[in-house]
Regions:
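N-terminal [4Fe-4S]-dependent radical SAM core
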Residues: 1-11, 60
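A generic secondary-structure signal marking the coil-to-beta-strand transition
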Residues: 9-11, 65, 193, 237
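Short loop/turn segments at secondary-structure transitions that flank enzyme active sites
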Residues: 19, 203-205, 247
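Canonical Radical SAM [4Fe-4S] cluster-binding loop centered on the CxxxCxxC motif
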Residues: 8-43
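Conserved non-cysteine loop/helix-boundary elements of the Radical SAM core domain that shape
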Residues: 29-228
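C-terminal accessory regions of radical SAM enzymes
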Residues: 233-248
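Short, flexible loop/turn elements at secondary-structure junctions
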Residues: 17, 73, 107, 245-247
Length: 248
């Protein structure tokens, strides 16, 4: 059951591959360079599963109302693999009845203009570009293989491809970040003028590299001071609409 609309459901499609593993991440993901041979068989299986979900939903009299392709990193797929997957979705579902169709395009080191065009062409109505921070030093420290400038370039490519609903994620409390650094990231995101900005606090699970290697975390007081900077979002006209809570 999705929301209060009767006989509807939401579809989540997970892509468990990443160009590198972020130090804070505890999600299931495979290294793209090491496990590239697994990607195409996985996409083939996903397409068969999409077809089966459609068949079962029709039997149950259910209508699809939202789609979310997340990960991992969905844009670790090639442009052709994205066409295959999103084409299968489009062939099986009436996208005119879908209220929101999101694809995470979070990593600029594997998101290019062609992939952004494919995502738009095949019906996505919302994408998420997730810098987490605009500090090159912090990006390197958490295992990202790209720069802050790469994020800006990716965002520009997304607008050129016609994407009109873009979310950007930031994380307060990343190792090596400071209150001033987080404020800079907030201001940079606001300057880009995306439709949504999502701020998370760093939440660590046992499977994250930060925990396993016992890396130093930011003090609670520093994280609290970072969150106080979120008044900048309200001043820029952003209004909260989403609440997510998670226990460590």
């Amino acid at each position: 059951k999705a929301g209060s609309v009767p006989k509807t459901y939401s579809l989540y499609i997970g892509i468990p591959f990443c160009p590198s593993r972020c130090s804070y991440c505890s999600f299931v993901s495979c290294n793209l360079d090491r496990d590239r041979k697994m990607v195409q068989p996985y996409v083939d299986c996903l397409c068969r599963e999409v077809e089966e979900i459609k068949a079962q939903a029709d039997k149950a009299g259910l209508t699809l109302c939202s789609i979310y392709i997340g990960g991992g990193t969905p844009t670790s797929l090639s442009a052709d693999q994205l066409r295959q997957l999103m084409g299968t979705v489009r062939e099986n579902f009436d996208l005119s009845q879908v209220m929101e169709y999101t694809v995470e395009a979070g990593r600029p080191d594997c998101t290019d203009a062609e992939k952004l065009a494919v995502i738009k062409e095949y019906g996505a109505t919302r994408i998420s570009i997730n810098p987490q921070t605009f500090s090159d030093e912090v990006l390197a420290g958490i295992g990202r293989k790209h720069s802050a400038q790469d994020i800006l370039d990716c965002y520009a490519d997304a607008r050129k491809a016609g994407h009109e609903d873009i979310n950007m994620d930031l994380i307060a409390g990343l190792p090596g970040d400071t209150v001033e650094g987080f404020e800079h990231s907030l201001r940079q995101a606001i300057a880009l003028d995306p439709e949504n900005i999502t701020v998370h606090t760093l939440t660590l699970k046992r499977a994250s590299r930060i925990v396993m290697e016992d890396q130093k975390e930011n003090d609670y007081a520093d994280v609290a001071a970072m969150l106080e900077k979120c008044h900048l979002l309200a001043e820029a006209g952003y209004r909260p609409y989403y609440l997510y809570r998670q226990k460590n």
